[in-house]
Amino acid sequence: MFKRVLTIATLAVLPFAPKGVSAQSNCGTKLYCLIPTAFHTTSSTFNFFNDAFGTQISQLPLASPASGFIYSFDKSGVYTASSESFGPLLSERSETIGRHKLYFAVTYQRFAFSEIDGNDLKHIPILFYYPNEQSPTVVTSTENRVDTKIDQVVAFATFGITSRIDLSVAVPFERVSMGVSSNGSEFSTTSTASASFHEFLAGSASGVGDVVLSAKGTLVKHERFGLAIGTEIRLASGDANNFLGSGTVGVKPYLVLSRRGMVAPHLNVGYQWNGNSVLAADENGNQPLPAYFGYAVGADIGLKRITFVADLLGEHYFNAPQISQPESVSASVNNQSMSFSSVVRVPSASYDADNLSVGIKANPVGHLLVSANALVKLNDGGVRARVVPLIGLSYSF
């Protein structure tokens, strides 16, 4: 019977991995290495899973940095709060906060990821073998579970430079917790020898995420309609190897069209560009994180001290990593072909990640706002949580 040490030393790479990549169990102590270490592979061997994880959990949605209170001069020349609602939560409206006005906010979100491309993260079958080697010695069939949770606290500040231009900063603080378990069976390709194993690894990391700087300017300001443009710049301030950040700078120009009133519809469209990141690395080095086209369409309904908000949020990712549903994969065991159930890499393509956001903003006193929101997934693209709760406090000066 072959030894466990020999098995680990000769563990096979995935069907889609490049030839010549050798498996190792010593990847490192960062969360980026947790999954490949549990599976006894290198991070480059298993980067299809880390790519998918990194694309999503390093670019978590943030609440809007726009103030719930909008100030402007009324017809009599008095500078006063002019909005009939407190605005959206996860999207923008065209109005700016007002000249020399200041806004602070803090939000908390919890992400409990449950699926990846429609696959339950509690049950991920993966087959490891050497399809390109002339004499592979080991085939390993595994059933895997990946538990990932992120607690995110974000501090926001917005300042009105002029009556038409706002500058904002968002500083996220995150705690990422991961647990990876793998149950597997190892088979000799030339004999009846076999062995079973179980691995469990857990880890966590805390720290500052990627800081986001943004500017928004109102282009058109009519009595009821407004048009604004803006740009977000995401800094690579978070530790990408611990999934606290994306590992690269990102730029997102966007356009906002909205209507003012008790019922205030709004439309946001934007394009997120990302640079090269370790989270998308392959045998040729760091590669770009997938870009995406994002949109938000919805409305907020303002009452005297309460605003109800609903948005359809969508992101269309380009050239993004995905994994398949489990399919039959054949490998040689005891010199005979045997079929195993396994997910495999889907060649980089496009997919959509759509969510429904429903929330409320309440004004208990003064210029204080209390917010609550639920982000509900509508489809299966990417690494997803079924529901993401949000609570927040904000104050305008």
Which residues does each PLM region occupy?
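Residues that define the transmembrane beta-barrel architecture of outer-membrane proteins
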Residues: 86, 98-100, 149-155, 202, ...
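A subset of solvent-exposed loop/turn segments in beta-rich extracellular surface proteins, enriched
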Residues: 25-168, 172-209, 281, 322-341
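Residues on the lipid-exposed face of transmembrane beta-strands in outer-membrane beta-barrel proteins
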Residues: 90-93, 104-108, 155-161, 169, ...
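Outer membrane beta-barrel transmembrane domains
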Residues: 124-128, 191-197, 286-397
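Transmembrane beta-strands of outer-membrane beta-barrel pores
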Residues: 108-114, 171-177, 210, 219, ...
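Hydrophobic alpha-helical segments and helix pairs
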Residues: 197-249
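Outer-membrane beta-barrel translocator domains and adjoining extracellular loop/strand segments
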Residues: 116-121, 180-186, 229-230, 239-247, ...
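Repeated loop/turn-to-beta-strand initiation elements of outer-membrane beta-barrel proteins
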Residues: 113, 164-169, 222-227, 261-267, ...
